Amino acid sequence: MAETILIETKTAGGNCRSYLMAGASYLGILCFVPLLMSRDDEYVYFHAKQGLVLWMWSILAMFALHLPGIGKWLFGFSSMGVLMLSVVGLVSVALRRTWRLPLISHVVALI
């Protein structure tokens, strides 16, 4: 009963613009560029939603710094998680695939 991580999209076209926009989705606040400019491309929109959730996670992690004692640890682990998932997302774009990222796929489905 393992959930599939690879999703087949109908419009994973071969143009370079789609891949550049999908790659920009995982670069922090740049996730808004493909989110707003490529809503009609299913491939780019999928990656933009995942990038948006990663960006929101990194913003929320900054608030953990205000917690006494455990805040720095929580921020460090969250930042490492966001960095690793962003790299996995960039690799999936480089391989022209659509992978659901493990920790955030349920939140992305709600968007």
Swiss-Prot record:
Its main location: membrane. Induction: Part of the probable 4 gene mamGFDC operon. It is found in: Magnetosome membrane. Residues 1-17, 72 are cytoplasmic. Keywords: Biomineralization, Magnetosome, Membrane, Transmembrane, Transmembrane helix. The chain crosses the membrane at residues 18-38, 51-71, 73-93. Disruption phenotype: Normal magnetic response, no change in magnetosome size or number. A double mamF-mmsF deletion has a normal magnetic response, slightly smaller, fewer magnetosomes. Deletion of any 2 genes encoded in this operon (mamC, mamD, mamF and mamG) decreases crystal size regardless of the protein combination. Deletion of the mamGFDC operon leads to smaller magnetite crystals in irregularly spaced chains, but no other phenotype. GO terms for cellular component: magnetosome membrane. It comes from the Bacteria. Residues 39-50, 94-111 are lumenal. The keyword Cell cycle does not apply. Subject to cleavage or degradation; identified by N-terminal sequencing of proteins that are about 103, 92 and 15 kDa in size. It is a multi-pass membrane protein. Belongs to the magnetosome MamF/MmsF protein family. May form homooligomers. This bacteria makes up to 60 cubo-octahedral magnetosomes of about 45 nm in diameter which contain membrane-bound crystals of magnetite (Fe(3)O(4)). Plays a role in regulating magnetite crystal size; partially redundant function with MmsF. This is Magnetosome protein MamF.
